[in-house]
């Protein structure tokens, strides 16, 4: 089994067939809708909120609303769908969440996307929730996770998941790998590669993305969609407190299983950090799209499919050549 991560890989260019990178198409059909880029912000409180969710939907970007304000979910679905936009929510696996799904069915509220959002998604509770959703609201596109093995992907797909999230603890504010000894931190890209061999349905690569080039690498190794937290945090439009440290502006960014999110010091597998203010989120999205268009042009194609077949080399932890600050 080849083990590697994002910084160990360089993709090998093919002959370019476009005059300009602007000819390259970055769109992706994911579930019932088509999106501008194969990227989704992490469903975390310091990355996504209702205002941003609406802007993303209006502008043909995928989003997943977090699940940490449970009472707000039904009004959110109604507001989005009454505005002619798609609703994409998250659920957990506690008993109340099973009741919540039944309530949606009773009220004939059918979110276009439901993400079952659990740190260790290869579990009976997630399998039961997938089946529960598919029984009561079969028209919702169900994303389940997170997993780190082909067995996990297969079991969730067999239960009825329409897409699976791959990644156990590789994120910047996730400390699962340190607290538990388990996870895909340090080999997330290889885990994605292995999982893709078993997958029959789309995969979302979740965690460990540090550069825009990592998006192209994720697609090469089997992802249809790439979930990103830290690169989307700390923008003007981002949720989270802005603080000034040594004359510079920062925003807080914390993990979904951190004490800052939970409000208590119990079962903590996330940490909090301050990320330097990055300016406009719209500028970052535009730059991501342009960089991905460049990636496609280097792959010798005109759309995302061309990235899936490029050759690569493994250059252990050396692609930055010491260029890190």
From Swiss-Prot:
Where is it found, in Gene Ontology cellular component terms?
cytosol; GMP reductase complex
Q: Which GO terms describe its biological process?
A: purine nucleotide metabolic process
Q: Which residues does UniProt mark as catalytic?
A: 174 (thioimidate intermediate)
Q: Which GO terms describe its molecular function?
A: GMP reductase activity
Query: Which Pfam families does the annotation name?
Result: IMPDH
Task: Read off the SUPFAM superfamilies from this record.
Answer: Inosine monophosphate dehydrogenase (IMPDH) (SSF51412)
UniProt keyword terms in alphabetical order:
NADP, Oxidoreductase
Q: Does the keyword NADP apply?
A: yes
State if Secreted is listed as a keyword: no
**Top-level taxon of origin:** Bacteria
InterPro entries, alphabetized: Aldolase_TIM, GMP_reductase, GuaC_type_2, IMP_DH/GMP_Rdtase_CS, IMP_DH_GMPRt
The enzyme's E.C. designation: 1.7.1.7
EC class = oxidoreductase
Q: Disulphide bridges in this chain?
A: none
Reactions mediated catalytically = IMP + NH4(+) + NADP(+) = GMP + NADPH + 2 H(+)
Q: Record-annotated residues binding NADP(+)?
A: 203-226
Biological role stated in the UniProt entry: Catalyzes the irreversible NADPH-dependent deamination of GMP to IMP. It functions in the conversion of nucleobase, nucleoside and nucleotide derivatives of G to A nucleotides, and in maintaining the intracellular balance of A and G nucleotides.
What family is reported? Belongs to the IMPDH/GMPR family. GuaC type 2 subfamily.
Q: What is this protein called?
A: GMP reductase
Instruction: Name its species.
Output: Staphylococcus aureus (strain bovine RF122 / ET3-1)
Gene name linked to the record: guaC
């Amino acid at each position: 089994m080849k083990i590697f991560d994002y910084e160990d890989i360089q993709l090998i260019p093919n002959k370019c067939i476009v005059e300009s990178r602007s000819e390259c198409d970055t769109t992706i059909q994911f579930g019932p809708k088509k999106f501008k880029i194969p990227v989704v912000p992490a469903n975390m409180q310091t990355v996504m909120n209702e205002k941003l969710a609406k802007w993303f939907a209006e502008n043909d970007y995928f989003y997943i609303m977090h699940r940490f304000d449970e009472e707000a979910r039904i009004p959110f679905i109604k507001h989005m769908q009454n505005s002619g936009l798609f609703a994409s929510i998250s659920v957990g696996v506690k008993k109340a969440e099973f009741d919540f799904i039944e309530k949606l069915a009773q009220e004939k509220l059918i979110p276009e996307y439901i993400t079952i959002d659990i740190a260790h998604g290869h579990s009976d509770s997630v399998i039961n929730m997938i089946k529960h959703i598919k029984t009561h609201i079969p028209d919702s596109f169900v994303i389940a996770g997170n997993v780190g093995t082909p067995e996990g992907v297969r079991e969730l797909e067999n239960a009825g998941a329409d897409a699976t999230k791959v990644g156990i603890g590789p994120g910047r504010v996730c400390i699962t790998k340190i607290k538990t000894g388990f996870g895909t931190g340090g080999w997330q890209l290889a885990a994605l590669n292995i999982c893709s061999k078993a997958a029959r349905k789309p995969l979302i690569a979740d965690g460990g993305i540090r550069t825009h080039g990592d998006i192209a690498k994720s697609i090469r190794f089997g992802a249809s969609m790439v979930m990103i937290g830290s690169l989307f945090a700390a923008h003007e439009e981002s949720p989270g407190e802005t603080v000034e440290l040594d004359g510079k502006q920062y925003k807080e960014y914390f993990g979904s299983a951190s004490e800052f999110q939970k409000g208590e010091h119990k079962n903590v597998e996330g940490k909090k950090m301050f990320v330097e203010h990055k300016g406009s989120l719209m500028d970052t999205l535009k730059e991501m799209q342009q960089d991905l268009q460049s990636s496609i042009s280097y792959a010798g194609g005109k759309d995302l499919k061309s990235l899936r077949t490029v050759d690569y080399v493994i250059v252990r932890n050396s692609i930055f050549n010491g260029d890190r600050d």
